């Protein structure tokens, strides 16, 4: 971990010197609907806000725009405090987004640009070396589905292995593997059946579907880019695009009619907007009677197993459960490679706790991160570089447990190769919060596609356990020992089981289970209804049933308790492996200075697909025993590697392994044959080499790959390699 800690330290020191310019990346050209965007270079803005702030003339231009955003942000807060009508709040939020976008665009236009990023070259390298490619390509491919090749699989596997060490091992989490097929009642209770949907429209003749917001955006951007479009209309379109995310079905439908939108593929008319649930539905079993879905997240499997996990943990809180697996979302129009797909791997943690202090918070409180709070977004301010400890102390981050996991996420992202200058945490604003969350921060990475959400860290409170308790009648709760016994008033439903059994037969169990879950408020409401109306309608998982005083009554008693029942809160870090993997590749894509055709990935050794390559200098038969011995010794110490004894110059073979992101290369040459047997070890990024005893190679490469030592340590210990002393058995 030495390399990782060094990187974190360097990031922390470096970050103190700059304030990062946190804007939403905007591509240099509009993305045309359905166009091939591969063959173009993309201008990535300089992420440093310090450059802008240092120029008073630039800040003078931005000051009134910041004031406009702050003014509107204050109005939004005021409307919320006054509990104004929802429509008024929505309009105010839409206007706030408009002003934010104007400010961000102006900041972006004033910021100096970094070098052009050649996405085409990177994607060519990814495809040519088979990191990943479109699934079923020989049949034309399926949009939003990808197959990982040998290098992609190894990179992904190493990322997950490091994730397990960072979280499961370090925090002693309970790992589970739950079913992908999920019965409908589970996802009804969680809210996914009702709320997990996007608006779409269809080609009335071909039936081809389009995600509505993407269709509108593509159509309007095409009009906007037309040189014949009037300035007034361009300005109006810009305003519409900014407000698009907050529009409902009626507003989008009006835009379709006004701009006479047709299918971008066929030119045919389109249907009115319809809601499309993003979950893949299926039938479980041959009868077709059991409806199910492919899970949209791995979390629900953990929640429904809460009682078993709590029991495994001897009934104690806090504890965390983790799961790694695939989830599925039937995206209407997947795009942007691995960033929006229909099948993806997630690493999710559910941390169950009753108090939100964390025992390890002290160890991470000085971690510096770039935080883009909801308040800063509303005020038109940039993200702040601050410590997690200060953020929790000031109430920017809700609690210690949430802050602890944000710090650990930050460290993990740096360890796998994310550029610290292009990493931030952005807090969800109230209008974009998921239905289950009371606070949420996304770890976002800046890429050529913009700021990409890669990790969500949500405070789900007790939402999920409460919902599943209501749906099943089974208490998903923990017991907490009280420091001293206390007297409480207990309100409970006393059921006449005999009469309920005769009256409702097979439904009697569902009735009794539901009665057991009613809280005091519901029981008091029941008593009120029974007294005034002579009956009470009980809603259960099997339907509604009318109960009378002869079947049930409500009783209040005094009771001494030694423990209290609590439904724990949940902090959920959720990692999108594919998105992180893509950002790692983009952040580590390099071109050799002076030779742009020599591209490679500067991946950290910890996650590199292979740790080293063994290369004989030529096809000389004398090299083969040494190559075999080296390979076997590397296998013995668990170092993944390959032997490249193909024809071609040593330089060409170095370049080939650099493309794969292999950090080290061991070369067997004529000096190896002599005693003592030595080889050269080459480092990928610097291309520098040292000469070391052949027997040292396995241990050195293993320790480099595990970040126990750095390349600088190796250079200090072993002599620099200039040239071999022997050529075909003759000393130079």
UniProtKB/Swiss-Prot annotation:
E.C. code: 6.1.1.14, 2.7.7.-
SMART domains: WHEP-TRS
Amino-acid positions noted as binding ATP in the UniProt annotation, renumbered to this chain: 329-331, 340-341, 453-454, 579
An example molecular function term from Gene Ontology annotations: ATP:ATP adenylyltransferase activity
Keyword Ribonucleoprotein in record: no
Domain WHEP-TRS: residue ranges: 61-117
Record flagged with keyword Protein biosynthesis: yes
GO biological process: diadenosine tetraphosphate biosynthetic process; mitochondrial glycyl-tRNA aminoacylation
Residues reported in the UniProt entry to bind glycine: 297, 348, 572-574
Transit peptide segment: 1-27
Gene3D superfamilies: 3.30.40.230, 3.30.720.200, Anticodon-binding domain, Bira Bifunctional Protein, Domain 2, S15/NS1, RNA-binding
Family named by the database record: Belongs to the class-II aminoacyl-tRNA synthetase family.
Function: Catalyzes the ATP-dependent ligation of glycine to the 3'-end of its cognate tRNA, via the formation of an aminoacyl-adenylate intermediate (Gly-AMP). Also produces diadenosine tetraphosphate (Ap4A), a universal pleiotropic signaling molecule needed for cell regulation pathways, by direct condensation of 2 ATPs. Thereby, may play a special role in Ap4A homeostasis. Required for terminal arborization of both dendrites and axons during development.
Protein name listed in UniProt: Glycine--tRNA ligase
Species assigned in the record: Bombyx mori (Silk moth)
Gene name in the database record: GlyRS
């Amino acid at each position: 971990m030495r390399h990782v800690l060094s990187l974190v330290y360097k990031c922390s020191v470096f970050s103190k010197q700059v304030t990062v310019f946190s804007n939403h990346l905007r591509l240099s050209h509009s993305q045309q609907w359905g166009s091939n965007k591969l063959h173009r270079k993309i201008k990535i803005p300089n992420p440093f806000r310090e450059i802008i702030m240092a120029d008073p003339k630039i800040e003078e231009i931005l000051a009134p725009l910041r004031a406009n955003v702050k003014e509107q942000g204050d109005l939004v807060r005021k409307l919320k405090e006054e509990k104004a009508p929802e429509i008024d709040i929505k309009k105010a939020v839409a206007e706030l987004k408009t002003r934010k976008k104007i400010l961000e665009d102006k900041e972006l236009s004033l910021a100096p640009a970094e070098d052009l990023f050649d996405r085409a070259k990177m994607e060519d390298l990814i495809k040519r070396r088979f990191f990943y490619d479109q699934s079923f390509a020989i049949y034309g491919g399926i949009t939003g589905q990808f197959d990982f090749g040998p290098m992609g699989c190894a990179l992904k596997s190493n990322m997950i292995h490091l994730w397990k060490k960072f979280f499961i091992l370090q925090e002693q989490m309970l790992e589970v593997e739950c079913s992908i097929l999920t019965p409908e009642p589970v996802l009804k209770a969680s809210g996914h059946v009702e709320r997990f949907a996007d608006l779409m429209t269809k080609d009335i003749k071909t039936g081809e579907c389009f995600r509505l917001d993407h269709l509108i955006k593509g159509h309007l951007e095409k009009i906007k880019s037309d040189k014949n479009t009037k300035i007034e209309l361009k300005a109006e379109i810009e305003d519409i695009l900014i407000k698009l995310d907050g529009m409902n079905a009626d507003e989008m439908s009006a835009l379709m009619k006004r701009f006479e939108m047709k299918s971008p593929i066929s030119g045919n008319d389109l249907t009115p907007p319809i809601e499309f649930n993003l979950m893949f539905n299926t039938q479980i079993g041959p009868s077709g009677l059991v409806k199910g879905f492919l899970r949209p997240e791995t979390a629900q499997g953990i929640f429904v197993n809460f009682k078993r996990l709590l029991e495994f943990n001897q009934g104690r809180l806090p504890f965390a459960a983790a799961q790694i697996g695939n989830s599925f979302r039937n995206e209407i129009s997947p795009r942007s490679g691995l960033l929006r797909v229909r099948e993806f791997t997630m690493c999710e943690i559910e941390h169950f706790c009753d108090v939100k202090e964390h025992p390890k918070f002290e160890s991470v409180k000085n971690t510096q991160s770039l935080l883009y709070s909801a308040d800063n977004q509303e005020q038109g301010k940039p993200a702040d570089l601050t410590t997690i400890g200060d953020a929790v102390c000031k109430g920017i981050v809700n609690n210690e447990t949430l802050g602890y996991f944000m710090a650990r996420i930050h460290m993990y992202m740096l360890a796998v190769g994310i550029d610290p200058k292009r990493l931030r945490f952005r807090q969800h604003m109230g209008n974009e919060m998921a239905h289950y969350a009371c606070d949420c921060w996304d770890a976002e990475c800046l890429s050529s596609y913009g700021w990409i959400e890669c990790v969500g860290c949500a405070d789900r409170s007790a939402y999920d356990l409460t919902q599943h308790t209501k749906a099943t009648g089974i208490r998903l709760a923990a017991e907490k020992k009280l420091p001293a016994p206390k007297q409480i008033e207990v309100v409970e439903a006393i059921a006449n089981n005999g009469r309920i059994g005769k009256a409702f037969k097979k439904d009697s169990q569902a009735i009794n289970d539901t009665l057991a879950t009613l809280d005091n408020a519901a029981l008091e409401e029941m008593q009120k209804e029974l007294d005034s109306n002579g009956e009470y309608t009980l809603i259960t998982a099997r339907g509604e049933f009318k109960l009378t005083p002869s079947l049930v009554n409500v009783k209040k008693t005094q009771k001494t308790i030694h423990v209290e029942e609590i439904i724990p809160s949940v902090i959920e870090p959720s990692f999108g492996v594919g998105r992180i993997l893509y950002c790692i590749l983009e952040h580590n894509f390099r071109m050799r200075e002076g030779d742009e055709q020599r591209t490679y990935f500067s991946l950290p050794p910890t996650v590199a697909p292979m740790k080293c390559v063994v290369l004989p200098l030529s096809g000389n038969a004398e090299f083969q025993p040494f190559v075999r011995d080296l390979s076997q010794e590397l296998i013995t110490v668990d170092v993944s590697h390959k032997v490249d004894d193909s024809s071609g110059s040593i330089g060409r073979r170095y370049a080939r392994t650099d493309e794969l992101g292999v950090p080290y290369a061991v070369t067997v040459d004529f000096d190896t044959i002599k005693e003592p047997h030595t080889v050269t070890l080459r480092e990928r990024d610097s291309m520098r080499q040292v000469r070391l005893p052949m027997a040292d190679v396995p241990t050195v490469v293993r320790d480099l790959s595990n970040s126990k030592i750095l390349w600088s340590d190796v250079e200090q210990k072993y002599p620099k390699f200039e040239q071999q002393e022997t050529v075909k058995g003759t000393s130079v």
